[in-house]
Structure formats: structure tokens, C-alpha cells
A protein has these predicted regions:
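Start-transfer (signal-anchor) and selected internal transmembrane alpha helices
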Residues: 1-22, 110, 118-120, 208, ...
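Hydrophobic alpha-helical membrane-interfacial segments at the cytosolic entry of transmembrane helices
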Residues: 11-15, 197-224
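Short helix- or helix-capping micro-motifs
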Residues: 16, 121-127, 168, 172
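Extracytosolic helix-loop segments that constitute the early lumenal/periplasmic catalytic or substrate-binding loops
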Residues: 33-60, 64, 71-81, 226-232
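Aromatic/glycine/proline-enriched transmembrane-helix motif characteristic
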Residues: 4, 102, 236-310
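Specific aromatic-rich, kink-prone transmembrane helix
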Residues: 104-107, 144-161
Length: 313
């Protein structure tokens, strides 16, 4: 079917990209995080994957994004970028993913709305000050794993669940925070593999591809050293042992910023997580609309941030 509105979304995406790139070059961003990304890109390129996690430097990211930063480091070394050009280059992967998220919103919206409304919805994201500040000015990379989470949800909602296994694997390989979206994948498996047209062949096929996604993660981890990667995940998951770190959530509202976790508050945090998952189960299976995957995803992200402990800005 011909898309009569294609030119509008292309122009919107191009303008949003250029705007982000310019702002990304003008503003360095969050000094600590940008120093990490720049330092990591140089370190992983100069020392290689195998030595990266053994270097005497701070690193709290899994290997997934290190592959991206390796390319960034190679380009930076080749062209000798510095200052604004360097800032823009480091932010470029997140900027590209930000734009792709907007395009994906357009694609999903077109299934229910007109071309014009779909373009408007995509533009609301592409020109949302919060996403621009987060990505281009602040220099954060949330849009990278957000893109893969949305692709996972998209493939599940389109009954192409096999692709979702690989999207989720890549996402976990980029940021372990993606684990909070595990219930969505489980819901998709229950609904698309077990409830609808269940068969032994279908189960084995999905099991095979699920294992393949895990094998993909293992293969990508090998250059870094399996033990190094496992240590990195366990260290990252155990970091920020506080009720909240500069996060505007329930604990921040109670004045608990940077307050260490006690045995009691740790239990409370787990209770909240169980309650969040239980509520997402209720909402998912009560809804008959296929958009429930997106809604439950938003619900999990919002409620986890607002109620869980160890959240940070």
C-alpha cells in the first residue's frame, strides 16, 4: 500500500536528526557520563575486547554497547575528532536510535490511525524536549536499548515472536535494566506459543530459537571473556545500594535520596517488584486489545521507576 505521507515523516525525521546532531556538538552533556563514553571508546579500541574489563578503570556497562563504542573509538582515532565533533560522534548511536524509535512509532500508529495522525504521534516523540535533552544535550544512551525493547514488543504484537527473542537478548546485552521488561516476553510466549494453536512442533521451534538467542549472547561475550562478562553483570546489578539516587520517585518524595538500603527496605523493594509484576499480569490478561503489550511495557517502566528501590537518574 502506497504511503502518501512518507515524505512528511522523512522530513520530520531528518529535521529531528539534524537538530539533535547540532545540539549534540554544541553541548558536551553530563560530564561524568560523557567522560566514561569517550574513555571507554578509546580504551576498548586501543586495548581490544579481551582486555577491556581487566583495565584499571570504572566501567558499569555490559559488552553490548562496547561493540558500538569500539566503532566510535576507531572513527575518532582515524579522523582525530575532538571537542564538538567528538561529542556529536559519541552521541551519534543514541541519536540514530532516537530517530528510529520515532519512525517505529509512525509504523505502529499507521495500523490504527490515519497517515496524518501517525506523523503527528511520531513528531511528538521526535521533537519532545525531554528526549532531545536526554539524548543530545545530556548525552545518555537510553534510546539504544529502548529501540530494541520496542522492537521486541512490536514483533510480539505482530505474532512474530521468534524475532523478539533476539531483540530481547541484544537489549539485555546492552543494558541489564532491560530485565524489567521480561514479563512482556513471558506474556508473549504464553499467549502465542501455549494458548494459541499449541503444538509440540511449535513449542520445539520456539525453544530452539530461544536457545539460539542465548547462544548469540554467549558468542558475543566470548571476545571479552565469559568470566569478565559475568562479573560485570553481577557488579552492575549490585550497584547503587540506595533507596534512590537523584530519582524523582516515591523514595525521593519521602526524602530518602542517597539513603542506604537496610534489610527492611530491601524486602520492601522486592515486595513492590512482586506487586508490580502481579498487577501487570492482571492488566495483560484482562485486556483483549493487542495494544496491551505496549501498555504493559509502559506500565512496567513507570511503576518500577516510581516504586522500586535502587533507581537513579
Amino acid at each position: 500500500k502506497k504511503d502518501n505521507n512518507a515524505m512528511y515523516i522523512i522530513v520530520a525525521a531528518a529535521v529531528a536528526f539534524i537538530l539533535r546532531l547540532i545540539l549534540g556538538a554544541v553541548y558536551r552533556g553530563h560530564n561524568t557520563d560523557m567522560s566514561c563514553f569517550i574513555g571507554w571508546s578509546n580504551a576498548v579500541f586501543e586495548n581490544g575486547f579481551g582486555k577491556f574489563y581487566t583495565l584499571d578503570m570504572f566501567h558499569d556497562y555490559p559488552p553490548g554497547y562496547m561493540y558500538v563504542l569500539y566503532i566510535v573509538g576507531a572513527i575518532e582515532k582515524l579522523f582525530g575528532f575532538s571537542d564538538g565533533a567528538q561529542y556529536a560522534l559519541v552521541k551519534l548511536p543514541a541519536i540514530v536510535c532516537d530517530i528510529l524509535v520515532g519512525v517505529l512509532i509512525y509504523k505502529v500508529a499507521k495500523k490504527k490511525f490515519s497517515d496524518g495522525l501517525s506523523t503527528m504521534f511520531a513528531s511528538l516523540y521526535l521533537f519532545n524536549p525531554a528526549t532531545i535533552v536526554n539524548c543530545s544535550l545530556w548525552g545518555q544512551v537510553d534510546s539504544v536499548y529502548t529501540l530494541f525493547i520496542l522492537l521486541m514488543i512490536y514483533f510480539i504484537s505482530e505474532k512474530k515472536i521468534i524475532y523478539s527473542y533476539f531483540m530481547f537478548a541484544i537489549c539485555i546485552f546492552i543494558k541489564p535494566q532491560a530485565f524489567i521488561f521480561t514479563p512482556i516476553l513471558i506474556f508473549g510466549i504464553i499467549e502465542n506459543v501455549f494458548i494459541k494453536d499449541f503444538s509440540k512442533e511449535k513449542l520445539l521451534k520456539n525453544l530452539g530459537f530461544g536457545v539460539s538467542a542465548i547462544i548469540l549472547m554467549v558468542l558475543l561475550a566470548l571476545p571479552f571473556g565469559i568470566s569478565n562478562v559475568i562479573d560485570q553483570y553481577t557488579t552492575t546489578m549490585a550497584s547503587y545500594p540506595y533507596l534512590t539516587v537523584n530519582a524523582f520517585n516515591l523514595w525521593g518524595a519521602l526524602g530518602k535520596n542517597w539513603e542506604g538500603l537496610s534489610s527492611f527496605t530491601t524486602v520492601i523493594g522486592y515486595v513492590f517488584l512482586i506487586a508490580i509484576v502481579a498487577y501487570s499480569v492482571y492488566v495483560f490478561f484482562k485486556s483483549k486489545n493487542n495494544a496491551k503489550y505496549y501498555f504493559v511495557g509502559a506500565l512496567l517502566a513507570f511503576m518500577t521507576y516510581m516504586l522500586s528501590t535502587k533507581m537513579h537518574d
